Amino acid sequence: MENWSQSIQQMIDIIDRCIRQQEDEALTLRALSAALRYSESYVSRKFRALSGMSLRDYLRFRHLAFALRDVRDTSDSLLEIAVRYGFSSHEAFTRAFRAAYGVTPSAYRLHPTAVVLHTILKPFDCYLLGIGGTGMAA
């Protein structure tokens, strides 16, 4: 990779593709690091520095963002959606959804409103972090 901003975008693209295709086994720090050709510790440190959250937390929020869309836009059962996005039970999904969005999935389905998705990488100063490049905008 020429610079880290391209690498982080590539990682996000891989994450989204894997979630859409339900290939969660590819969503490990080891697999993502190998795809980017960086060490696991480097990817973990830089991801946290750029996003303000661990890769694990980002993956959880990203799964919830996809699940939120399905709750709103499909008639699939909440259990089907929960299982699709890696939750062990309807209850675990409901707890995570409520913690992230302040409302249960069933209440959100009845009255969908705008919610804050915690999956946008915050702006950063690439020179301050010592990684070069021009930022997240490509």
Where are the model-predicted features located?
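Basic/polar phosphate-binding segments, predominantly the helix-turn-helix DNA-binding elements
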Residues: 26-59, 82-104
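…primarily DNA-binding HTH/wHTH and HhH modules…
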Residues: 1-6, 10, 95-138
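Glycine/alanine-rich phosphate-binding loops at beta-alpha junctions
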Residues: 1-45
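Terminal helix-turn-helix DNA-binding modules in bacterial transcription factors
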Residues: 13-20, 26, 30, 49-85, ...
